[in-house]
């Protein structure tokens, strides 16, 4: 019984092997018959004057990189090309029902479709793949390729920018009289387009011209549109007699701003608002100018970082560059104002006299507008009632805060009748004169101290004034500059959302 089952398995294996061999033999015979008199250098057209139609279909696999400095987009694509070659048709009945044959593309004629806006030395497809032959004569060739195409980068709204990149394909040799390149799309529309010379061209447009069914989402870019256009263009410099057809695939890319917002925009905004703290720092600390210079150095580092990201262009200034320039101007002004404030703070009565307009503006008007009040005024109000003596005797008590009133009190005091009748001895007179002299010195010193305090208060008022001005300027400048980007108000959803894998769509990264 066991031997019977082994024999049955061996018999089934032999039958399957014979069928497989017969199938391979039919395919081999078909291949030999097709290649006997086939010339792969000849254009497979039924008439020498009739153009051969090539249908193109681009399937985007991945956007590998968009290099802003070199202005190059690198992407992985599958370029599907379909045409009819009557010399490669057959009757499946004569070849054991074989209706599809796979052959190396080097063995048959293939169109010389190249990337016109190529950015490296590989203009055509170099990967060796097989073409699919159908018994009707239809040939399909869909090789994978990694293309580097030139893409003009617009840095006006960086890092909240959109870029328009394209891939332009066409035949390098055959004009429209010999090769007609068509869009392999079900829905097409036709429109007129005026070129730079004012010539009206008929353009075929496919709104969904790029297949995204196998697209792997980019971590930096969202796809907003994928239009394909077919044009016929003359090249007067080389071939003015006839036009050449090209198919251009446009990719409108919108940058995902999370990375640059966290690593570039937020630090810039933070550095900008650090400028305000310069005016809150006391002048006696001696670190006001140091803080200004430190902020200026930090902004310079960000400028150097920005030049490594964006292309060196003189056409426009990026949005973040405008904001950095605005912040640098603010920091420079803060350095100037800080130097003026420090100069006022350390002025003395022996070098500078305070003008009357400075007293009116900085000691009376501005403090009221800025809701500032000097603590010394409270002490003066408290001791105003203690200036006059109550008992008519000599008032020798020292002022709680200043001693400038001592001399006046001595001169203006009402002397006791008994003391007035006494004979003043020379030691008493000398002592009295010394007391008056000391009182004058103390009064002068007190006056100088008051002038010093007035200059310091002027510097404090100036700091408070520019603290308010710079706070408003930084806030308004940040809002006006950064919120001008159009993409911040673009509510369109990326069209590649529906093609993203389930694991990326179900667990989006939130900020």
From Swiss-Prot:
Family in the record: Belongs to the ligand-gated ion channel (TC 1.A.9) family. Acetylcholine receptor (TC 1.A.9.1) subfamily.
Any one Gene Ontology cellular component term annotated for this protein: acetylcholine-gated channel complex
The protein, known as: Acetylcholine receptor subunit alpha-type unc-38
Organism from which the protein derives: Caenorhabditis elegans
Biological-process GO terms, alphabetical: calcium ion import across plasma membrane; chemical synaptic transmission; inorganic cation transmembrane transport; locomotion; monoatomic ion transmembrane transport; neuromuscular synaptic transmission; positive regulation of locomotion involved in locomotory behavior; regulation of egg-laying behavior
Entry-linked Gene3D superfamilies: Neurotransmitter-gated ion-channel ligand-binding domain (2.70.170.10), Neurotransmitter-gated ion-channel transmembrane domain (1.20.58.390)
NCBIfam families for this protein: LIC
Keywords: Cell membrane, Disulfide bond, Glycoprotein, Ion channel, Ion transport, Ligand-gated ion channel, Membrane, Postsynaptic cell membrane, Receptor, Signal, Synapse, Transmembrane, Transmembrane helix, Transport
